[in-house]
Amino acid sequence: SIMFSDFAGFTKHVEHMEPKALIELLNQYFSAFDKIIFNHKLEKIKTIGDAYMCASGLPAESRGHAIRICLGALEIQNFLERSNEKREKMRMQRWDMRIGIHTGPVIAGVVGERKFTYDIWGDSVNIAALMEQHGEPGRINISETTYQQVSEIFETENRGSINSGKKGDLPMYFLNRLKEEFSEDPDGIKANSVFQQKFGGLMKIYDA
């Protein structure tokens, strides 16, 4: 499973920012994301400007990779919302993200000679990017294949489809939260003991 995210209206945000302040702010956000995805055993792929990309189910396998990445995305979204609440109290502009997730096969490997980079390629990467591009600020947009693997666990919203050209119509869903019976907190961000009992086996990581 692949997650793409970027800040909505980034160009407008940075027009009046000093370079040092921008770098410090991006570092603050991306460092927080790094901690979140580490806790969910996700693999950071790269950052490009204001975009952040990670994946689940590689390099070590996990049958619950789609669940893991959705839990990570919800926690990232929750972190951003708490951050924006603080910014609004200080009369500062909100920084909202569009997050897109797709589940499917990818090619993964290390490339380069002097500066090695672990990266992923394939149609699944492109579809994850489309999910992000056609999302909304402050929301998590998931594909049909991700939805099929997580709909028993999370509350979702059907959004209809987008036409992707070669791939035809791609159904999309908003991922809102964990279902109440699986949630430890009122916001549906953290999984509870009922979730662990029912889905704990799926969440195991198997070394490749």
Report the location of each language-model feature.
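Hydrophobic framework residues that shape the active-site pocket
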Residues: 10, 29, 33, 52
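Structural signal for well-ordered, non-membrane alpha-helices
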Residues: 30, 34, 77-84, 105, ...
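Cytosolic regulatory/linker segments at or just downstream of nucleotide-handling modules
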Residues: 106-108, 134-208
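Conserved catalytic/dimerization core of cyclic nucleotide/dinucleotide signaling enzymes
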Residues: 13-25, 44, 68
